[in-house]
Curated annotation (Swiss-Prot):
InterPro entries: Cyt_c_assmbl_TM_dom, DsbD_gamma, DsbDN, DsbDN_sf, Thiol_diS_interchange_DbsD, Thioredoxin-like_sf, Thioredoxin_CS, Thioredoxin_domain. It comes from the Bacteria. It is an enzyme of class 1 (oxidoreductase). The chain crosses the membrane at residues 183-203, 219-239, 256-276, 297-317, 318-338, 339-359, 370-390, 397-417, 421-441. One of its GO terms (molecular function) is protein-disulfide reductase [NAD(P)H] activity. It is found in: Cell inner membrane. The keyword DNA damage does not apply. Required to facilitate the formation of correct disulfide bonds in some periplasmic proteins and for the assembly of the periplasmic c-type cytochromes. Acts by transferring electrons from cytoplasmic thioredoxin to the periplasm. This transfer involves a cascade of disulfide bond formation and reduction steps. Keywords: Cell inner membrane, Cell membrane, Cytochrome c-type biogenesis, Disulfide bond, Electron transport, Membrane, NAD, Oxidoreductase, Redox-active center, Signal, Transmembrane, Transmembrane helix, Transport. This is Thiol:disulfide interchange protein DsbD. It is a multi-pass membrane protein. One of its GO terms (cellular component) is plasma membrane. The lineage of its organism: Bacteria, Pseudomonadati, Pseudomonadota, Gammaproteobacteria, Enterobacterales. It comes from Yersinia enterocolitica serotype O:8 / biotype 1B (strain NCTC 13174 / 8081). Residues 1-24 form the signal peptide.
Length: 578
C-alpha cells in the first residue's frame, strides 16, 4: 500500500514538473494548437524593411535594408516633397519578378539606396516616402509612409548634377506596354494610307531637284537625309512631350485624367474611320509648305531642311496616330522611350519613301480602296490605347471585357470587308475570322450569362464588409451567438487573392464555414480608419484571418497570418476550439 502511494506521488510530481508541451498533450489539443498558431512566422515591417535617411548639403540619401526572403515593390515607392524642390533622379531597374495576379513587376532585395539632389528646401521642408513590400512566404505589409525632415537650402546655394535619365518626384517613369519597335511597324503602315502614299512620287521628285541625274549612291544619300530630317522633328516632339509629361506624371496617373485621356484617344480613333478630319490649320500648312518649297532640292542641307519641315505638316491620315502616340508618351513620362518611339515612327514612314526615291514608282502598289482600309485598321490600333489606360482604373476583369469588345469590333469589321472577295482562300479566311470572333466574345458571354465558375466565386465570397472598428464591433454584436471569421483583405496583397482563388473556393472549406458569420475588412486604401483597425487588432500585414467565439471574443490561438492552402486551412478550421 505504501509502495503504491509513493508511486502515485512520484507520478503526480513528474506531471507537474513536465515541460509545458507534455502537459498540453495530456490536457487536450487546444493548448498545443494555440501555441503553434499564435507564433507569427513574420517580422514587423521595421525589421523587414529597415528604412534610414541622411542629408548632406544638397544631397538626400534614402536607404532600405531588406531582410532575407522579403522584397520591396519598385512601383510602390513614391517620393513626394513638401515645401522643397528636387532635381532629376531615378530608381534602379530592380529585379524582374512575376506575380500571378499582377504580371511582370520589378522588385528590390537585400538593399536599396536612392540619392536625390535637392535644388531648394524652405523652412520646415520635408519629404514623404511611401513604400510597400511582401514576404516570399506569402505575406504583404500595408504601404508605409515616412516623413523625412529636410534642412533649409536656397535655390542658388546648390549645384545639382542630374543623372543621365531624369525622373520626377514620383520616380520610375512608366514603361510603355508596347516595344518601341512597334512604332516602326506603325510608321510603315501609315505610309500606305490614302493621304500619304500618293504623295511619295511627288516628294521623291522634290528631293532630287532639277539638277543633272544623280548616281544611285547620291539618290540613296538624299533620301536618307530627308528621312533623318523628318525623324529629327518627330524625335524632338517626343522628347518635349515626354519632358512635359514628366513634370505632371503624378497628376497624369489620376483616374479622372486617365478617363479623360481615354476619351480623347477614342475621338482620335473616330477620325481614322472618317467621321471627321484632323489636320493643322490651312494657313499654317501653307506657310510650312512655302518654307519647304524655298529649300533647294538635290543639296544635302536643303533636303534635310525639307524633311524637318515635312515632319510638321500633318495630313488627316497622320494627325490622329501622331497625336495618340504623343499623348501616350506624355502619360508615360519616359523621355528615352518617347524620343526613341517617335524616331522609329518617322523611320517607318520614311522607308517606303527611300524605296520610291531609289527605284521609282514601279514598286508602289496601285492606289485603291485598300488604302482607306489601312487607315481604318489604324483606328483600331488607336482604340487599344484607352483600353490600356482604363485597365488601371477599372481593374483586370473589366479590362478583359473591354479587350473582348474591341476584338469583336475588329474581327467583325474584317469579316465584313472579306465578304467583298469571292476567291477560295477568302472563304477560308472568313471562317478564321468567325472563329476569332466567337473566341473574342467569350468574356462578354460569361459576363452576360454567367458561368459555373463565377457562381462558385460569388458563393464563397459572400462576406459582410466592415470598414472600421465600430462596424466590426457592431457586426460581432449582431452575430447572435455564432462564431465569426474576419478576413483582412487588400488589392495590393497577392496572397489575399490566392486565398480567394484557391482556399475560399474549396467546397470542403465552404461547408466547414457554413455556420460561421463571415466578415471582411478591405483595407486597400490604407486610410486612417484602416490603420487604426489594424493597430487595434495588432495586425502586422496581410493576409490575416481572425476568429471570434460565440460571445464575440477573439481566439488568439486561431489567428492565421500568411497564405494557407485549402487542405491546411480546412485542418485549421477543424482544430478550432469549440
Amino acid at each position: 500500500m505504501a509502495q503504491r502511494f509513493i508511486t502515485l506521488i512520484l507520478l503526480l510530481c513528474s506531471i507537474l514538473l513536465a515541460p509545458h508541451s507534455a502537459q498540453a498533450s495530456l490536457f487536450g489539443d487546444n493548448s498545443s494548437f494555440g501555441q503553434k498558431s499564435s507564433q507569427s512566422r513574420f517580422i514587423p515591417v521595421d525589421q523587414a524593411f529597415a528604412f534610414d535617411f541622411r542629408q548632406q548639403g544638397d544631397q538626400l540619401a534614402l536607404s532600405w535594408q531588406i531582410h532575407p526572403d522579403y522584397y520591396l515593390y519598385r512601383q510602390q515607392i513614391k517620393i513626394v516633397p513638401n515645401n522643397a524642390t528636387f532635381g532629376a533622379f531615378t530608381l534602379p531597374e530592380g529585379i524582374a519578378h512575376r506575380d500571378e495576379f499582377y504580371g511582370e513587376v520589378a522588385i528590390f532585395k537585400q538593399q536599396l539606396t536612392l540619392k536625390i539632389p535637392i535644388t531648394q528646401a524652405g523652412e520646415r521642408a520635408s519629404v514623404s516616402v511611401t513604400y510597400q513590400g511582401c514576404a516570399e512566404a506569402g505575406f504583404c505589409y500595408p504601404p508605409e509612409t515616412r516623413v523625412v525632415p529636410l534642412s533649409a537650402i536656397t535655390a542658388g546655394s546648390s549645384a545639382v548634377t542630374a543623372p543621365p535619365i531624369a525622373a520626377p518626384a514620383t520616380p520610375a517613369p512608366a514603361e510603355l506596354p508596347f516595344s518601341p519597335l512597334w512604332a516602326l511597324l506603325i510608321g510603315i503602315g501609315i505610309a500606305f494610307t490614302p493621304c500619304v502614299l500618293p504623295m511619295y512620287p511627288l516628294i521623291s521628285a522634290i528631293i532630287l531637284g532639277r539638277e543633272k541625274p544623280h548616281s544611285q549612291r547620291r539618290i540613296l544619300l538624299l533620301a536618307i537625309v530627308y528621312v533623318q530630317g523628318m525623324a529629327l522633328t518627330y524625335t524632338l516632339l517626343g522628347l518635349v512631350v515626354a519632358a512635359a509629361g514628366l513634370q505632371f506624371q503624378a497628376a497624369l496617373q489620376h483616374p479622372y485624367v486617365l478617363i479623360g485621356l481615354s476619351a480623347l484617344f477614342v475621338l482620335l480613333a473616330l477620325s481614322m474611320f472618317g467621321l471627321y478630319s484632323l489636320q493643322l490649320p490651312s494657313s499654317l500648312q501653307t506657310r510650312l509648305v512655302q518654307w519647304s518649297s524655298s529649300q533647294r532640292g538635290g543639296s544635302l542641307a536643303g533636303v534635310f531642311a525639307m524633311g524637318a519641315l515635312a515632319g510638321l505638316i500633318c495630313s488627316p491620315c497622320t494627325t490622329a496616330p501622331l497625336s495618340a502616340i504623343l499623348l501616350y508618351i506624355a502619360q508615360s513620362g519616359n523621355m528615352l522611350a518617347g524620343g526613341g518611339t517617335l524616331y522609329l515612327y518617322a523611320l517607318g514612314m520614311g522607308i517606303p519613301l527611300v524605296i520610291v526615291t531609289l527605284f521609282g514608282n514601279k514598286l508602289l502598289p496601285r492606289s485603291g480602296p485598300w488604302m482607306q482600309y489601312v487607315k481604318e485598321a489604324f483606328g483600331f490600333v488607336i482604340l487599344a490605347l484607352p483600353v490600356f489606360l482604363l485597365e488601371r482604373v477599372l481593374g483586370d476583369v473589366w479590362g478583359l471585357r473591354l479587350w473582348s469588345l474591341l476584338a469583336i469590333a475588329f474581327f467583325g469589321w474584317a469579316f465584313i470587308l472579306s465578304l467583298k472577295a469571292h476567291s477560295g482562300w477568302a472563304r477560308a479566311f472568313q471562317l478564321l475570322l468567325l472563329a476569332a470572333l466567337l473566341i473574342a466574345a467569350r468574356p462578354l458571354q460569361d459576363w452576360a450569362f454567367g458561368s459555373p465558375t463565377q457562381q462558385s466565386e460569388i458563393k464563397h465570397l459572400a462576406f459582410k464588409q466592415v470598414a472600421d472598428l465600430p462596424q466590426l464591433q457592431a457586426a460581432l454584436a449582431q452575430a447572435k451567438g455564432k462564431p465569426v471569421m474576419l478576413d483582412l483583405y487588400a488589392d495590393w496583397c497577392v496572397a489575399c487573392k490566392e486565398f480567394e482563388k484557391y482556399t475560399f473556393s474549396d467546397e470542403q472549406v465552404q461547408r466547414q464555414l457554413a455556420d460561421t458569420v463571415l466578415l471582411q475588412a478591405d483595407v486597400t486604401a490604407n486610410s486612417a480608419e484602416h490603420a487604426a483597425l489594424l493597430k487595434e487588432l495588432n495586425v502586422l500585414g496581410l493576409p490575416t484571418i481572425l476568429f471570434f467565439d460565440a460571445p464575440g471574443n477573439e481566439i488568439p490561438a486561431a489567428r492565421v497570418t500568411g497564405f494557407m492552402n485549402a487542405s491546411g486551412f480546412l485542418q485549421h478550421l477543424q482544430n478550432l476550439p469549440r
